[in-house]
Every structure is written in structure tokens, then in C-alpha cells.
Amino acid sequence: MKASGTCSESCLDGLFYYTRFVDYNATLIGRSSLSLLTAAQLAELQRIDSPTIANAIEQFDVRGRVEGFAGWELRCAFPELGTTVGYAVTCTADSTTPARRDRGLMRLWEAVERAPKPAVIVIKDIGQDRSRSCHMGEVMATTAKALGAVGCLSDGGLRDVNEVRALGGFQYFCPGFVVSHGNPVICEVDVEVTLNGLTVGPGDLLHGDVNGVLVIPSSIADRVAAQAMKVREAEAKVLAFVRQPGLTAAALKEFQDSFTH
């Protein structure tokens, strides 16, 4: 199920007597991320930087090379936390339309509680002024962490940067920060969303660091870490060669020819 791009009819009326919600397990049926990794496998992925993971995924040829990752607009707020790995809990939200009443937030918390752990909350802004939107601050981040989330990914604004940094272990990925929360409303929960070119569905495995965020296809998730090690080994050979004194283009070509055959 994809997000409609707007709130449901009752949401538009400001009533919020109905918020689209699908049982988490039912949403995952048929999705690639139904098979979950072990804690050890997740820890192994967390020790690897996201660009290396991206390079490893390319080796499996399971998607196009310009698919599966977010653009530069979604920035890592706390690079000192290292790599964030978790399963997506998705929703749409609007904080810039006046006079709305929110009855969807508890639905989100219920979805986070039921989701595979660690979880990453993914919030798609569908309001009328995304540059002034705000979808999470200290209270929501603290609640999310208590329920097993390790971060929030949003194409809208977030806030309370210092307080959320002080939580430790909770990452923000967003375009920027906003001082006021406006009129925050959760519209739909457990829907497929697209943020800055990255399409995310409920249960998708996310991997992100200071370089950005991507989705690891479940069909290869248990093999990506091992492939990433091979990528690192190959890159180490290239780096060792080009760091030698007196490098020439001719020598580089000869090396590359031998390296690729």
C-alpha cells in the first residue's frame, strides 16, 4: 500500500476519526523484508560504512544503481553515532496545516512497539509547507527510543537537536531543523513512502551514516556484509597502488587492466 500523498478524508476534515492503519505483520506479507536478520548479522552490518554497503549491493545486481538510496537532502545529524541500522516503521505527517486534530500518533507508537528491532521511524511530510514542517523533537525521540527505535528519517524538519543528541544512540536524518513544532499530525501509518528519491516500505532494512541512507534488499541482506568485506579488500589494493610514489597514468592503466581481468 502506498501513501496517498494527502491525509484521509476525515483527516482533511480535521476530525481524525479514521487513520489508515494496517496490521504490521499483514503489511509485511509479500514484502522482501519479511525474513529478519539475527542480532549478530545486524551488528556486523553496523560495523560497515554505508558507501561500502552500497558498493556491495551493486555486486548482486538486484536493482538499478540509482535506486535504493536517498539524495543529499537527507543529512545525518549526529555523525559521531556511527552507522544506524534498523527496520522501517513508516508514516505520513503534516505539521503545517492549521486546525487539525491528531489521532494518529498512538497508532504510530503501536506500530513501533510491534515492529522488528531495532526500528527506524520514517516520516513522509505531506503538509503544505515542508520547509517549515517539524515532525519530531525531544519528547517524541525519547518515546521512540524507549519503544525500541534507534532513529528517525524524515524529509521534513526535526528539532531539539541538543536534547536528542544527549539521548545517545538515537539518530536524525533530515533536511534541517525547525524551531517550532507547528500543528503536528500523523496521517497514515505503515504505508510505502518516498523521501528524497528513496522508497521505503514497512519493515525495509535501512542502513545509514554521515554519507546518507539506503535500503538493503532483504533477498541479499544476509550476504551483504561478507560482500562488503570483499569490496574493502579490493579497494585496499587500489589505494595501496595509487599511494606509491611516482604514479603515472600508464602504470595505473596497466594495474587496472590486471585488476579487472
Locate each region found by the language model:
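Feature captures the catalytic cores and cofactor-binding loops of soluble hydro-lyases/lyases
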Residues: 21-202, 216-261
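Ala/Thr-enriched low-complexity intrinsically disordered regions
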Residues: 3-6, 19
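Channel- or pocket-lining gating/hinge segments that regulate access to a cavity or pore
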Residues: 211-214
